[in-house]
């Protein structure tokens, strides 16, 4: 019984593919020109990559590597000096 139901479901799931339109039908509202889309995406990616390299090389963007390193906890002035604890 389960095999019959499973085969019926597979048949019903596959029926819409038999009625599918020709992918080269240019009048179809769901026809996509994949070549133009791919070329446009590559051009856009190339422009964004070039702009990113220009911004990094221009020097206007201050990177964290050029800043002075922060003080370490051991290098700061001592909070408790000798003899200051008895003044509380």
Swiss-Prot record:
Membrane topology recorded in Swiss-Prot or TrEMBL: Single-pass type I membrane protein
Signal peptide region: 1-20
Segments in the Extracellular topological domain: 1-38
Keyword terms, alphabetized: Cell membrane, Glutathionylation, Ion transport, Membrane, Potassium, Potassium transport, Signal, Sodium, Sodium transport, Sodium/potassium transport, Transmembrane, Transmembrane helix, Transport
Stretches that traverse the bilayer: 39-59
Keyword Cell membrane on entry: yes
Subcellular location field: Cell membrane
Chain intervals for the UniProt region annotation (Disordered): 67-88
Major place of residence: membrane
Hydrolase is among the record's keywords: no
Disulfide bridges in this chain: none
PTM notes: Glutathionylated.
Topological domain ranges for the Cytoplasmic compartment: 60-88
GO terms (BP aspect): potassium ion transport; regulation of monoatomic ion transport; sodium ion transport
Top-level taxon in the UniProt lineage: Eukaryota
A single Gene Ontology CC term: endoplasmic reticulum membrane
Tissue expr: Expressed at high levels in heart, skeletal muscle and liver with low levels of expression in breast, brain, lung, stomach and colon. In the gastric gland, mainly expressed in the mucus cells forming the upper part of the gland and is absent from the parietal cells.
One GO MF term: ion channel regulator activity
Record family assignment: Belongs to the FXYD family.
Cited function: Associates with and regulates the activity of the sodium/potassium-transporting ATPase (NKA) which transports Na(+) out of the cell and K(+) into the cell. Reduces glutathionylation of the NKA beta-1 subunit ATP1B1, thus reversing glutathionylation-mediated inhibition of ATP1B1. Induces a hyperpolarization-activated chloride current when expressed in Xenopus oocytes.
Known partners and oligomeric status: Regulatory subunit of the sodium/potassium-transporting ATPase which is composed of a catalytic alpha subunit, a non-catalytic beta subunit and an additional regulatory subunit. Interacts with catalytic alpha subunit ATP1A1. Also interacts with non-catalytic beta subunit ATP1B1. Interacts with the ATP1A1-ATP1B1, ATP1A2-ATP1B1 and ATP1A3-ATP1B1 NKA isozymes.
Miscellaneous comment as given in the Swiss-Prot or TrEMBL entry: Marker of a cell type preferentially transformed by neu or ras oncoprotein.
Protein's name in the database: FXYD domain-containing ion transport regulator 3
Organism: Mus musculus
Species classification: Eukaryota, Metazoa, Chordata, Craniata, Vertebrata
């Amino acid at each position: 019984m389960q095999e019959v139901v499973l085969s019926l479901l597979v048949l019903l799931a596959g029926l819409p593919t038999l009625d599918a339109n020709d992918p080269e039908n240019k009048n179809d509202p769901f026809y996509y020109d994949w070549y133009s889309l791919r070329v446009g995406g590559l051009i856009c990616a190339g422009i964004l990559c070039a702009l990113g390299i220009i911004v990094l090389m221009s020097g206007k963007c201050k990177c964290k590597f050029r800043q002075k390193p922060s003080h370490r906890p051991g290098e700061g002035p001592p909070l408790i000096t000798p003899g200051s604890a008895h003044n509380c």
